[in-house]
Amino acid sequence: MTPSIQISTLDAAREADLSIYDGVITIENSNIETPLRMDSSPPEQLVLRFDDICEPIDDFIEPQEIHIQRALTFADKIGDGSLLIHCHAGISRSSAIGLSIIAKKLGKGKELESVEILEKINPYSYPNKSLVLMTDDILERNMILYKMTSDKMSLTDTRIL
């Protein structure tokens, strides 16, 4: 069973009633000036700080496997609870992290179903290519998750967003 996942922009997350979620994954740019932080009350929040890039650029922070692993561990802790995953635009990084969580929950052999669920959650998904490749490796999907994702939707191969 997959967790209830919602993907949004940073602005939408700022305006949302976050208390309705069991967990919030905040993915922020390395140069964010006003980060979104939860107060001490539920839900729990995981903050990941990296930029929407696929190769090294100046002082920007590249996505790394540890970001995916931390998100997967956080989602495991939430279990079948509800998750809000947001990044600045709600398109690339949050979609890729959402896909990693869905694919892990569904298990091997369910890669196409994982991508289809992501499409239903966020029809505007353009997952970060680097994150999808790393997820495929972490979950030992032998490029199947990456291929299914790239066949069904566009992947961002951004220089910087």
Question: Model features per residue range: what roles?
Answer:
Residues 1-42:
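Glycine-rich, flexible N-terminal cofactor/catalytic loop recognition
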Residues 28-29, 50, 89:
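Glycine-rich His-Gly loop
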Residues 33-34, 56, 92-96:
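Short catalytic/ligand-binding loop motif for oxyanion handling, primarily in non-cytosolic enzymes
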Residues 36-50, 157:
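Long, contiguous secondary-structure blocks with strong helical propensity
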Residues 67-71, 93, 97-98, 114, ...:
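Amphipathic alpha-helical interface surfaces
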Residues 75-105:
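Catalytic cysteine-centered active loop of the rhodanese-like fold, especially the PTP/DSP P-loop
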